[in-house]
Structure formats: C-alpha cells, structure tokens
Amino acid sequence: MSDISLAESIELNSSVPKDDQVFDDEIPDAEVQSEPSEEPPKLKRRLYLEEEDKTDEALSTFVNLEDCLYSNKHVGNCNSNDFMECDCYEDFQNGKNHACGEDSDCINRLTLIECVNDLCGTCGNDCANQRFQKKEYANIAVFKTKMKGYGVRAESDIEINDFIYEYKGEVIEEEEFRDRLVDYDQKKFRHFYFMMLQSGEFIDATIKGSLARFCNHSCNPNAYVNKWVVAGKLRMGIFAKRKILKGEEITFDYNVDRYGAAAQKCYCEEPNCIGFLGGKTQTDAASLLPQNVAEALGVKASEEKKWIKLKKAEGQKIEKSEAENINIEFLESITINPCNTATDVQKVMSVLLQIENKTVAQKLLQRLYLSSNEELLHHVIKLHGYTCFTKLLQLFALEEDELKKILYFLERLPKTTKNGIISSHIDFQVKSVCKNHSSLSSIGDSLIEKWKAYEEYKRITKLDINNSTKTKLQDIRRIKLPPGWEIVFENGRPMYYNAEKKTKLLYPPTGASKTFASQKSSSPIPKFKNKRDQNNGIKRKLTDEEYEERKRKRIELEQENIKKAKEEELQRLKAKFNQEREQKQILENIIAEANRKKEEERQNQLKIEKEKKDKKESKKQLSQISKMEHKWTKFFASVVPNILKKYESDKKIDHDNMKQCARDIVKILAAKEMKKDSSKEPEATVSKEKRHKIKQFVHGYMEKFLEKLDKKKQRH
C-alpha cells in the first residue's frame, strides 16, 4: 500500500463457505458488472446460520459509537439551513404515531429527509420517519468468514428498502482524510474504513465506528448506501436492495462509495464477479455514478456496462472524479429523457435537494424541463420544490444561461398558495438574480408579480387538530387530495382550495380518497354543514316578494359570475397558450442546440478520421514510391558508371565531374521509369536491349556535357 490515493474499496469482501445452505434465486434489481445485459445474473443465496455469532468479539476491535463524531461544527452539514416540514398529520394508534410511514406519501421521506420532533408542525412527535434518530436498525450479527475476516448477516428476514444500519465514524475534512490515509498505511493497517459523505468530507470508521463497518463487498450486492438529512446533518445508512433472507450476508458495492487502499482481490464468488475491487482507475468494477444519481437520471446498469465496454475496446482509461465519485465523461454522454411518473420526479428532487455538482444538476433539471405533465409539475412543488429551486438559483448564481432556464421553468409551474414561496424565500432569491443579471429582469419581475397575486392561507396545524371535534379536523388528515388541491383555513374553518382553478370547496373535490396512513379508521370523509343546520335551526317561510327578489338577485349573480368566469378562462387560456408557445420555443432551441453540437462533433470526428486516413494513405503511397525509386536507382547505378569509364580515359574528364555525371544520369533515368509506371519494378538483370538504350542515352547526355565543357574552357 505504498501508493495511497483516493481509491475505492478497502477491506476484503465476502467469502462463501461451500458447505453452507444454498438457495438459487433471481434478483431482478441486482446491479452487476458483467457484459451489458438486461438479464440479472443468477445469485446463489448462501445462508450462514451455522456460523458462530462473533458480534461481541468484533465489538472489541474498535470503539462503538452511539452517533458520529464531528471534527468541527461545520462538517456534515447539509446545504440548506432551513428545516423542511412535511405535510402529514399525526396518527396515533395503540400509543404509536404511524404518521410518515413507508406507504404514507410523506414528502420528507420521499426526498430523504427525516422529520424532527417539534420542528414538523403537523405530523407530531416520534413519527415513523425517524429511523436514524430512533436507531431502528435491522436484527444483524457479525460472523467470521473463511477468506477475509468478519462479515455481517441478517438474523431475521429484511424487506426491500428497509433500513439496516447507520454507517458511523469520525466525520473529517479532506486534508485530515489524506493525512490519515498515509498514517494508516505507515502503521500497516490491513483495512481502511472510509466513506465519502459529501464533497470534501469523509466518514472514518477505522478506529471508531459501528457494526456497519463489517459489511463486506459484493459485485452483486443485496444492500445499497444512501444519504439522509437528519436535523441539518447528512447521515449515511445501509438499506436493503432486495429482500434479504435470515442468515444471508449483507453486502454492498464498495466501488460506489468506499475509499481506501489500492485494488484488492475480490472473493464474493458472484456469477458476475470481476476479480478485484477498488483502485483509482475504474475498470469493469466501476459504477460510473452513485446509485441514487443513476436512478434519478434514469440510467440503467446495462448502459454503464455498455459504455465501459466501448471505452475498453478503444483502449481508454476510465476514471472518476476523485472529489465526487462521478465519471464526468459518461455523465456528458447520457441522453436525457423527461420524467414520466411521480416516482421519476421523486428521485430527481431527492438528489437535487442535496446536489453540489453543477453538471449533475443540469442533467437532472433537463428531465424536469422536458416534462409537460401538469400533475407531475404539481409533484415538483409538493416535494419541497420552491426550497430546492432557491438553492439551485444560488448554485448557478454566476451562470446566466442556466438561471434563465430555471426562471422559465418556475414560470411554468402551476399556481398554488403563496405559503411555499414565503417559507422558501425564493422571491428574494429571484430579486437577487435580477439585480446581478439585468438581462433576466423581465422574466424575474414577471415571476415576482405572478407570485404576488397568489393567496396566502393559514394551514391546519397540530393545535388546530387537537382543538377540533372528532367529526371534522381529525378526519381531514385521512383525505388524500388530487394534485393541485390543498386544505387551508379561511374564517376559522377548513376549505379545499385549488389555486390554479381559483376554486374553494366545503367538501372534498372529485378524486379525493382516504390516505394509506389510516387503514383502521372507519370515519367517513367529512362534509361541513352550515351553522344553522348544526344548531337544528328552523327555516322561516319567505313571502312571495322576498322569494322573487332573491331569485332575481341569484340569477343576476349567476350570470355575472358566468361572464366573469368566461373572461378569466379566456385570459387564462391565452396566457397559458403564450407561455406554452414560449416554453416550446425554449425547448426547441435547447434541443436544436444539442443536436447542432452533436452534429458538429460528428462532423469534426469524421473530418479528423478522414484526415488521418488520407495522411496514412499518402504516407503509404510516398513510402511505396520511394522504395520503387530506390530500386530503379540501384538498377541504373549498376550499368551507368561502367559506360562512363571510357569518357574518363578518352576525353580526360576529371573524376569528380564523372561522378556527378553518373549521379545525374542515374537520377534522370530512374525518374523517367517512375513517370512511365511507378508500380513497375526493374528486372533482376539488365537485358541487351535495355543496356543498348542506356548507352544511347548516356552518349547523348555526354555529348552535350562535353560540348558545354569545351565552351567553358574556351571562355577561360
């Protein structure tokens, strides 16, 4: 380990005893590193039930931490300073708060944020979205493997996406990380336990950590690593990638997240095992992008493998950015598709909320820009959309083109209440953008004016629910509303409000349904009666005059409302048409520019290839001509000097002049032959006919030469 660098993987991976129980099972979501294929490899689920529990022994080899230790108060902080609340409602059953559970559609849970007691206004304390804080770990044990030390197994079945364990350790900055790499290497530590938390920050579990440090590597793992925001800090957890059976070893892919020493031999024995893991240069083992980023971009494992195979065929090295574990070249090559489902939007937003890399952010934003489904745009807003875009405006503060795209996208978002805009402070951020980029003032000012027209409402709080009657507010939390609808307070009572449609209802809108969180509740969706009905008031009979007057006023009001609604609808349709036309033009420009660049790159590549081919062909031709000319020169050089000997003795021409004449004659004769046919080779021997022709040419040449020589002597 003399050459220490930011290289993936550290400790040897899982070995598998041959005498253990084996189950064949196909894992549909397994990430593999074999040849590109949509079909996952067959994974043999080996169970280690008979292996002795070594948990206590393993705990004696390091300092077991309750929580991560931070080298200073700044490390581990997420980028957003404001806590993001969910919109779930407290749901106590049998003394336990079931709010924000796995199937609750909790916006914090969907975007990898844990709820915090007393900070989330409505979901209540100790909700189901506090797995890191409550240390709700899976039932696991440490055992001894045959090939490389400790491993971790499941002591009971673990369902897909279940939280297994938090990866704890000392959270340090990059300078300290590099120092420790060298220090551990000098101390001859066999295994390092580093994980990148975020750019420039690492978790070191080498000396202080948790049982998660013993999870080994596999080329076809059953677990994955994800980063969650917990009370303003980024924390790293290991989650089940598929259902894990009792007795199975828990593994994840070191090449995605782990940092440490040089490449090491891999013992996972998976069908797709590439034989080693780690090292700075990524090869077959490389996951080119972190799993959450790849999923958010819609990139399949087969696409990564195909790209790796292509690069290997071209003899190119495949390297990741040391700082962020991302292959930028692969990222740039990805074809971006729009978000088509709410799940697509959720994956994109969860990454954007933690994003630091501008290139990744641009690619993810393109997925949103290309999406035109209004229901999905409502989903963007719901998943802390305004908070997310406030951060993105800060991230791209110096890049005017990207800011312009973001502002136009914000203009496309459907109307909602003003509450999200106020809480995220996005209006102040847009004003800051306009101040620093005057060319964006028009769209920015338009956006601010649009938001000013939005209505602000008091949202239902936990206190409102506690003070309400059982037939009303306590059951409101059971209702799952269609996209664009919210429950707000107006004049002390709840209303169903749709800002886009400018509609308020006393009753749940069409499409409303019960939420998942309250399966045991049998209360119907509430319908709010007027005060007189609640008090069982008696309705007085109207006189004929009163009845006609009310009827006339009602008809006038209805006609006026219909006329106003038609005018508003016409204006809304015109504005929407103009907005869609403008957005369509922007998208067409983006696509055209991308196609132009792609075509330009293709033409440049074709030009380079043609130049290389022409140069090679020209060089080849010149080489062939040069060789042929050399052969003819040798051919004539074997004859001409002998013919010239008599001129040297008879005519008394000096030796230097005679040598020069021989060179000139040979050169002329060779050139003549090349001119006739450059591909024709000279004969092996000089024929009589050829020798005769050479003599004739030599005599003619020498006569002219002697004539010139005589004239020269006469002048002198």
From Swiss-Prot:
UniProt GO molecular function: histone H3K36 trimethyltransferase activity; methyltransferase activity; RNA binding
Q: What is this protein called?
A: Histone-lysine N-methyltransferase, H3 lysine-36 specific
Q: What is its EC number?
A: 2.1.1.359
Pfam families referenced in this protein's UniProt entry, alphabetically: AWS, SET, SRI, WW_1
| Coiled-coil ranges (or none) | 539-628
What is the organism lineage in this UniProt record?
Eukaryota, Fungi, Dikarya, Ascomycota, Saccharomycotina
Entries under InterPro entries matching the protein? AWS_dom, Post-SET_dom, Set2_fungi, SET2_Histone-Lys_MeTrsfase, SET_dom, SET_dom_sf, SETD2/Set2_SET, SRI
Q: Which CDD domains match?
A: SET_SETD2
The UniProt record lists the WW domain at 479-511
Q: Where in the cell is it found?
A: Nucleus; Chromosome
For bias type Polar residues, the affected ranges are 515-524
How is this protein annotated for GO cellular component?
Answer: chromosome; cytosol; nucleus
As recorded in Swiss-Prot or TrEMBL, the protein's gene is named SET2
Outline what the protein does: Histone methyltransferase that trimethylates histone H3 'Lys-36' forming H3K36me3. Involved in transcription elongation as well as in transcription repression.
- The species this protein belongs to is Candida glabrata (strain ATCC 2001 / BCRC 20586 / JCM 3761 / NBRC 0622 / NRRL Y-65 / CBS 138) (Yeast)
Entry keyword Signal:
no
